[in-house]
Amino acid sequence: MAGERPPLRGPGPGEAPGEGPGGAGGGPGRGRPSSYRALRSAVSSLARVDDFDCAEKIGAGFFSEVYKVRHRQSGQVMVLKMNKLPSNRSNTLREVQLMNRLRHPNILRFMGVCVHQGQLHALTEYMNGGTLEQLLSSPEPLSWPVRLHLALDIAQGLRYLHAKGVFHRDLTSKNCLVRREDRGFTAVVGDFGLAEKIPVYREGTRKEPLAVVGSPYWMAPEVLRGELYDEKADVFAFGIVLCELIARVPADPDYLPRTEDFGLDVPAFRTLVGNDCPLPFLLLAIHCCSMEPSTRAPFTEITQHLEQILEQQPEATPLAKPPLTKAPLTYNQGSVPRGGPSATLPRPDPRLSRSRSDLFLPPSPESPPSWGDNLTRVNPFSLREDLRGGKIKLLDTPCKPATPLPLVPPSPLTSTQLPLVTTPDILVQPETPVRRCRSLPSSPELPRRMETALPGPGPSPMGPTEERMDCEGSSPEPEPPGLAPQLPLAVATDNFISTCSSASQPWSPRSGPPLNNNPPAVVVNSPQGWAREPWNRAQHSLPRAAALERTEPSPPPSAPREPEEGLPCPGCCLGPFSFGFLSMCPRPTPAVARYRNLNCEAGSLLCHRGHHAKPPTPSLQLPGARS
């Protein structure tokens, strides 16, 4: 049909971006320029919200809501990741640009971009098995070969990602998705919103650590301490995921024992592992959780170890015989954390198709598992106020400009080079433009100061408040000399991380807003040199929109709706192609000012000090009546 839009789809496993099954789109024997192929691929990947139906909400995160949708023309089922924060569009664009360049069976497949009211929303493939965390918490029996295959899939995806010069920084069992097939399960790695270029450590360069970001339960100890870190932080997170696979317990320290220095408590963890667990699999998980980053093996070696362990596993048949040899381990066994396994585990019975952890129900939050001793275990994440028990997500703010991550392998380092940090090129970027101030021009200062005089330390238990706009450029009050700059977001702690609310304790008038299904707190980094604000102002101040979602009060029905700020195409979905002549995203006309400027009217109503005591002066007399 003439004028019919081509169906939305992503490139195949062997296709390059912009190429379809028939080549570049010009027929056999006709070559097309690369700009044409890039333009065709970009336009065919664009969609609108009206192009989909049968939306079903299947999840929600800190920044987005996930929907299962079906394309009306092609009938293809996909996942629409709707961005909730307008200020998070830079991170969304970075994730879209990175996923558009990744092609691997164990990396979540990118399908296209949905543009709606100036916002970008990613379209990915639908995984019918949910997340790995959901699979492990279900009563689904998982044999050891199945768990080894899942671990191998994740390791292969991360090996491919690291080979491209990028590391994940937020690898969790929540971000690993599972596909159910007739032959078994397949795991893929998703959620690349915090991915970063692998830093190259060289001598003689400035040491500047990367931002402290990620989910605390899976973050490496060096990241939580604010030290220099690299792609080996993903290896530690992978070790925590392996512990979840082996014991089928959540990563919460109430179930997965941890040490006070954020390491793995190996003796306590061994009490959760059955005798049928393959010993090399257990040792590999312990090795990945090593406290020293340099002793953790890269994913090229981890995938080899997992393949060797799988070769030693017998087939899932009742008459299978146990193997005579165990899988060789070439990694350094001295890198095991304190209290490593001192005794060899008994060889598992290969006739069992189900592991010992499958025979018990998933742990209940009301009854944490017993670890075989009478010692009181302490959650190390609850000892630091900035981590709030670990049930938050650490983010980097302000959002970086949308610059494509270079997909080039990192230069190999010799063993004699010292791990010195250089500032990645992706960090040297101009600041993003601040949003226009939408506050009332002549609003009095009293309501803004009243928040510091509230009786309670916590915010009011009302609904969501209006997000705080950046109005620093138009502030009439100069900064007093000799004082440290005040924090616009929250108070900087000793570890230069500040929190917005707690997610580990029930709500009270002094602990923050009420809890919901999603993790209610988002932690952002603050510069180390900022001082504390007086009067505990940070407990009542709102963070920027890039850190926490705030919704504005709904305007009256008669008021015109203010359109979202348009996003120019050279910096959004077509940014990687650098087309200066193309503009695909809608740019609505500027909105009319929401409030009247009352500066002229308010001037006559103000009573200035010193003038109210003057006696009234007589005015001119009116002429008298004449006969």
From Swiss-Prot:
Expressed in testes and brain (at protein level). It is an enzyme of class 2 (transferase). InterPro entries: Actin_reg-Ser/Thr_kinase (IPR050940), Kinase-like_dom_sf (IPR011009), Prot_kinase_dom (IPR000719), Protein_kinase_ATP_BS (IPR017441), Ser-Thr/Tyr_kinase_cat_dom (IPR001245), Tyr_kinase_AS (IPR008266). It holds the Pfam family PK_Tyr_Ser-Thr. Residues 1-36, 316-373, 436-485, 500-519, 532-565 are annotated as: Disordered. GO terms for molecular function: ATP binding; metal ion binding; protein kinase activity; protein kinase binding; protein serine kinase activity; protein serine/threonine kinase activity; protein serine/threonine kinase inhibitor activity; protein serine/threonine/tyrosine kinase activity. It comes from the Eukaryota. This is Dual specificity testis-specific protein kinase 1. It comes from Mus musculus. The gene is Tesk1.
